[in-house]
A protein has these predicted regions:
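Beta-strand/loop-dominated core regions that host nucleotide or nucleotide-derived cofactor-binding catalytic loops
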Residues: 5-37, 43-101, 105-108, 112-152
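Short, Lys/Arg-enriched, disordered terminal segments
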Residues: 1-3
Length: 152
């Protein structure tokens, strides 16, 4: 299967049908020397995402901002309040009580872009589903993995 086609199918499967239309045209794909699988995807030497062994995608904050052009992609995001914004930008986890809004497509273990006023400030891994995040007022909702302030 063509690498770009596989990447598009993966994006659509994880984040919703039609999200792959926002994949930049000029991308460079690197492959694992040992297995020959897709390893990293770059645009102008900026990392967009990494394909995980389990078939998932680890997206960067930069790529999440590109995909945010799609209204469907917003259902995979959550928005934090002003109080927690500086902590999230520094890599701290997002707690349920600081979530202002969350999309309905958030599942446990999924990559979740974290927004503040419609701008991606970080990307993390969901600890709870969207339904649980909305109902709970305590505990960690998302463990932050990548922020806009982090190098790379």
């Amino acid at each position: 299967m063509d690498s770009i086609l596989k990447l598009k199918y993966t994006l659509d499967a994880l984040f919703g049908i039609g999200i792959s239309r926002h994949l930049p045209k000029e991308i460079r794909i690197t492959y694992s020397k040992r297995t020959g699988r897709i390893q990293h995807v770059f645009q102008n030497d900026k990392l967009l995402c990494t394909l995980r062994i389990d078939g998932g995608l680890a997206i960067t904050s930069y790529f999440a901002q590109i995909l945010l052009k799609s209204k469907k992609f917003r259902e995979n995001c959550l928005e934090v309040d002003e109080d927690s914004k500086p902590f999230v930008e520094n890599g701290s986890s997002v707690f349920c009580k600081h979530v202002m809004w969350c999309g309905k497509n958030i599942l446990i273990g999924a990559d979740v872009p974290i927004l503040y006023k419609d701008t991606v400030i970080a990307v993390g891994r969901a600890v709870l589903s969207s339904r649980m995040i909305k109902s709970l007022k305590r505990g960690v909702a998302v463990k932050v993995r990548d922020t806009l302030k982090s190098p790379g």
